[in-house]
Amino acid sequence: MKTGKTVAVSQTETAIKAILANPIMMTAFRSGLPAEGKLFPDGSKVVKIFWSFKKNEVSPYSVNVPDALKELAFIEKDTKRFPNTHGWAYADWAYDAATDTFKPSQLSQSGAECGYACHTKVSAQDYIFTAYPKR
């Protein structure tokens, strides 16, 4: 996504993520979404870039930094194409360092319903976990 802007960064137990959104979704984020009962417009897109992480050994304080690229995840809203998942489609691509290519992950091979199942926890936020932090 060449026109993606940074929404936020996050860290799980196994990865650091950069979360980017296209201009349609960024406009919605800046207007206050995800908010209770408000929906992202069709055409909204998110890309998440996952890296493993390591401790920066030269920093004077404890900080984790990106290490190896792990995967890319894509989320797109199109209520006509994806009615079974409230308009959201999910795709996940695992990075293969040996071939320097991406391949569909287990999540992608399971279909949009698999990504949707996880996101039902935030249905009140139109199925999007990450908010747009103040800046």
Q: PLM features: residue spans?
A:
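Sequence context surrounding c-type heme c attachment/ligation sites in exported
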Residues: E13, G37-R135
